[in-house]
C-alpha cells in the first residue's frame, strides 16, 4: 500500500487558528498536507484572507461521512465552546519530551513499522522485530540521546535521534538525523519540537554537521528541513524502488563553520539534556 493510497482510509475534522485568533473548521484525509495548503494560501478563501497558522484542534473520525457530520457539529458551536474544545485538545495533545529507554522499543517500533509498510519515508520494506529494535534503542542512545514526544495521556507521538554519518574517524563531527511521527500526530508541530530539541543537543555535544537523507519526492519532509535551516546539497534519481521508483536527496545543516581543527565531541550531562528538553515542553 502506498502512502497516497493510505490517505484515503483516514478522515479528520480540524480547526485551524488564524493570525487574528479566528478559528476555521474543516475536514481532510491528510492533516499535514491540508495545513500546508492553508498556510501557503492554497486552502480555503477564509484562511487565505485571515492567514492560517496552526492546528488548534484535530480529531480522527471513522470515515469521510463521520468527519463531515462532526465538521457540521463543530461549526454550530459558539466561539466560547470552540475555544474550550481547543484548550482541552492542546492540554492533551501538545508534546511532552523525554528520553527513551529500552522499555520504549515496542512503541517506537509500532511507529517505524507503520512507515515500513505504508510510506516511502523509509526505504525498508520488511518490518523490523522487537528484539532488533530493543538493540537499536540501546546502541542509538549510547551515542546520542534518543528523544520521545508523548501527549498528555502518555501516547507516543514521535521520536528523533541521530547516528554517525559514516564509520571512518574523519567523520566524527557529522551525524545523520532520524525523525518519525505517529501517523495521527503529523501536522501539528510534533516534528518541529522534536527536531529543534535534537539539534540543540547535537550543538551542545560539539557536532559540526547534520545530514538528513530524504526520499525524493517527499515534500512534507523537505518543508520541515528547509524550515529548520537545512539546504538540499544533492539529489540522486532512481535510487530505490518502493511503491514505484524513488530518488534520494541529501539535506545539510551546519551547526558550526570554520577551518580550524575541531574539538572532540562530548556527551552532555543528564542535567544539560533535561535543561534543553525543558525549553520545548508544552
PLM region descriptions:
Residues 1-94:
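GIY-YIG nuclease catalytic motif and its immediate N-terminal context
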Residues 96-108:
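A short beta-loop-alpha structural element at the N-terminal edge
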Residues 161, 211-214, 231-247:
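Conserved catalytic-core motifs of GNAT/GCN5-like acyltransferases
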Amino acid at each position: 500500500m502506498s502512502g497516497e493510497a493510505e490517505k484515503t482510509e483516514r478522515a479528520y475534522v480540524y480547526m485551524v487558528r488564524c493570525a487574528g485568533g479566528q478559528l476555521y473548521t474543516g475536514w481532510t484525509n491528510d492533516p499535514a498536507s491540508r495545513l500546508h495548503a492553508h498556510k501557503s494560501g492554497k486552502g480555503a478563501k477564509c484562511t487565505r484572507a485571515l492567514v492560517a497558522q496552526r492546528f488548534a484542534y484535530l480529531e480522527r473520525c471513522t470515515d469521510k461521512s463521520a468527519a463531515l457530520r462532526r465538521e457540521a457539529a463543530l461549526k454550530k458551536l459558539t466561539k466560547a465552546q470552540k475555544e474550550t474544545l481547543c484548550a482541552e485538545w492542546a492540554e492533551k495533545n501538545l508534546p511532552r519530551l523525554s528520553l527513551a529507554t529500552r522499555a520504549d522499543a515496542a512503541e517506537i517500533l509500532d511507529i517505524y513499522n507503520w512507515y515500513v509498510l505504508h510510506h516511502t519515508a523509509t526505504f525498508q520494506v520488511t518490518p523490523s522485530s522487537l528484539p532488533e529494535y530493543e538493540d537499536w534503542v540501546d546502541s542509538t542512545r549510547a551515542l546520542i540521546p534518543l528523544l520521545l514526544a508523548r501527549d498528555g495521556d502518555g501516547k507516543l507521538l514521535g521520536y528523533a535521534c541521530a547516528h554517525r554519518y559514516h564509520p571512518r574517524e574523519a567523520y566524527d563531527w557529522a551525524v545523520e538525523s532520524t525523525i518519525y511521527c505517529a501517523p495521527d500526530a503529523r501536522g501539528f508541530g510534533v516534528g518541529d519540537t522534536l527536531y529543534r530539541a535534537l539539534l540543540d543537543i547535537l550543538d551542545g555535544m560539539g557536532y559540526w554537521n547534520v545530514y538528513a537523507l530524504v526520499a525524493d519526492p517527499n515534500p512534507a519532509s523537505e518543508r520541515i528541513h528547509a524550515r529548520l535551516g537545512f539546504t538540499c546539497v544533492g539529489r540522486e534519481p532512481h535510487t530505490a524502488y518502493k511503491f514505484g521508483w524513488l530518488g534520494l536527496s541529501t539535506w545539510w545543516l551546519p551547526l558550526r563553520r570554520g577551518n580550524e581543527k575541531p574539538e572532540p565531541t562530548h556527551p552532555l550531562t543528564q542535567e544539560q539534556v533535561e535543561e534543553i528538553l525543558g525549553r520545548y515542553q508544552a
